[in-house]
Amino acid sequence: MLPSHLNGHSPLARRCPRLSAASPPATGDSDAAAAAADAPLAEHDRIYFQSYSHIGIHEAMIKDRVRTDAYRSAIMHHQKFIEGKVVMDVGCGTGILSVFCARAGAKCVYAVEASEMATQAREIVKANNLDDKVVVVHGRVEDVEVEDKVDVIISEWMGYMLLYESMLPSVLFARDKWLKPGGLILPSHATLFMAPITNSERYEGSVDFWSDVYGINMSALVPLAKKFTSEEPSIEIIGGENVLSWPFVVKHIDCYTFKAEELKSFTTKYKVSSMMLAPIHGFGLWFEVEFNGPSNPTDKSPSDLNPLDVIRKKRRRGSEDPVVLSTAPEDEPTHWHQTILYFPDPIEVKQDQIIEGSVKVSQSEENPRFLNIQLDCTTGGQTLVKDYAMR
């Protein structure tokens, strides 16, 4: 578990495994399942899956009612596509989503889990009298060889700032190998948002604090505090009042068509205007996922929409609209919080002042589950170029 600079959360202490499915074996200990579980792992995968063997991560995820209720609502919303069908749960963890799907009438659910939590998932399935419907497969989705096609793929693959931990490629692998034409993917779409933020309380508490400690001048520590604060992305909760402009779209993902290669590196340019007079302390990132069918070719992606239209659409959703899970600052907090890229020094902006630049997100060469972020920001004649490593 790696330390987070600002709040003690380890980014790696979060997400879930990569997986695979198979036709229901006669027993939970089939040769295919054993082979998948024993397949050699890269060191970064071994550490990653080992972290998901600890109950604490699963407790945090399941206790996140925004997350868990959104998935349960999405399953019931799409019950007619699940009832009597074959479902694959990629990275099932404790098996809670698999149980939801089985209770929604799925004929068979392949619950694929690469960590040792698969053992407990199998016991949970049995304790709920669903072992005739839910087959727990212990192994990575990339390592299981099966002939069956599935009607639905469900997965809770999102990491901090959506893409940290890089589990999405496993879902796309399952899609390409096992999803039937016209099948359903839950969630279906994901959008990563970003906006400049102000957070004087946070900055003063971590940096300015050192100027006077119990009457002792410790300002010699201020440069170190600035470096420490802006070295890595911070996982913390901010509110809508901290956001200085309308958000812009960093990346939109259609899970029906997206290619894993697109995650290796991408750059987004932005140009926003400040809604108030305030210091910019950095940029915040958050995401939302939507549980829907394939996109209509005529549909606009979020990058084509005015941010105000995106927010208004979210606020007026009716019972027939797709279920949306949002981690935005103005919405109820989740265990994902928001991801903050702090500046070493704040930049003062006036109302309506233009803030522009680019953000580049790329997978780390040392570990594809890690992210490198390069931020370029220009406003009021000042330019900041800063690299962040999300380890």
Swiss-Prot record:
Residues 20-35 have a biased composition (Low complexity). Its EC number is 2.1.1.-. GO terms for molecular function: histone methyltransferase activity; protein-arginine N-methyltransferase activity. Residues 45-391 form the SAM-dependent MTase PRMT-type domain. The active site is at 156, 165. Residues 1-35 are annotated as: Disordered. InterPro entries: Arg_MeTrfase, Methyltransf_25, PRMT_dom, SAM-dependent_MTases_sf. S-adenosyl-L-methionine binds at residues 58, 67, 91, 113, 142. GO terms for biological process: chromatin remodeling; methylation; regulation of DNA-templated transcription. It comes from the Eukaryota. Pfam families: Methyltransf_25 (PF13649), PRMT_C (PF22528). CDD domains: AdoMet_MTases. It is an enzyme of class 2 (transferase). Keywords: Methyltransferase, S-adenosyl-L-methionine, Transferase. Arginine methyltransferase that can both catalyze the formation of omega-N monomethylarginine (MMA) and asymmetrical dimethylarginine (aDMA). PANTHER family: PROTEIN ARGININE N-METHYLTRANSFERASE (PTHR11006), PROTEIN ARGININE N-METHYLTRANSFERASE 6.1-RELATED (PTHR11006:SF70). Belongs to the class I-like SAM-binding methyltransferase superfamily. Protein arginine N-methyltransferase family. PRMT6 subfamily. This is Probable protein arginine N-methyltransferase 6.1.
